[in-house]
């Protein structure tokens, strides 16, 4: 699997946004602006949502002509109840919501890359990614593994 996600902090909403930034699938790049942070409301997903592409573990809105929804880390409390979530991440996000200085934006982005995405990008493992986006995008996965049903329609 050769998918990459861009991790951006949106200071206006104080959320961390994840967006797919490229794909190796018949040489076609993902549509949508690569530098802009998506709007708060999810875009409408067209009928041709790109399910034929080889990417696994990304919601169908990743291939929308309007651009993908932000996969937002909005609920530290939700993550605290998740078995596989690293123990210090909910604390970091909770402190940020209280306005306490805990990590710089660069450090926070590096934390997500090192602890969340390395295994997913290099080995094709999506389990940890799905754990962290429980409170984010609600569109269905392109090819969800059998028991996983995190991205369900609203």
Swiss-Prot record:
Protein origin, superkingdom: Viruses
Annotated segments matching region Mitochondrial targeting sequence: 68-117
Post-translational modification: A fraction may be phosphorylated in insect cells and HepG2 cells, a human hepatoblastoma cell line. Phosphorylated in vitro by host protein kinase C or mitogen-activated protein kinase. N-acetylated in insect cells.
Regions annotated as coiled coil: none
Cellular component GO terms, alphabetical: host cell mitochondrion; host cell nucleus
GO biological process, one term: symbiont-mediated arrest of host cell cycle during G2/M transition
Subcellular location: Host cytoplasm; Host nucleus; Host mitochondrion
Keywords linked to the UniProt accession: Activation of host NF-kappa-B by virus, Activator, Apoptosis, Host cytoplasm, Host G2/M cell cycle arrest by virus, Host mitochondrion, Host nucleus, Host-virus interaction, Modulation of host cell cycle by virus, Transcription, Transcription regulation
HAMAP family: HBV_X
Family: Belongs to the orthohepadnavirus protein X family.
Function of the protein: Multifunctional protein that plays a role in silencing host antiviral defenses and promoting viral transcription. Does not seem to be essential for HBV infection. May be directly involved in development of cirrhosis and liver cancer (hepatocellular carcinoma). Most of cytosolic activities involve modulation of cytosolic calcium. The effect on apoptosis is controversial depending on the cell types in which the studies have been conducted. May induce apoptosis by localizing in mitochondria and causing loss of mitochondrial membrane potential.
Subunit structure, interactors included: May form homodimer. May interact with host CEBPA, CFLAR, CREB1, DDB1, E4F1, HBXIP, HSPD1/HSP60, NFKBIA, POLR2E and SMAD4. Interacts with host SMC5-SMC6 complex and induces its degradation. Interacts with host TRPC4AP; leading to prevent ubiquitination of TRPC4AP. Interacts with host PLSCR1; this interaction promotes ubiquitination and degradation of HBx and impairs HBx-mediated cell proliferation.
Official protein name in the record: Protein X
Species assigned in the record: Hepatitis B virus genotype B2 (isolate Vietnam/16091/1992) (HBV-B)
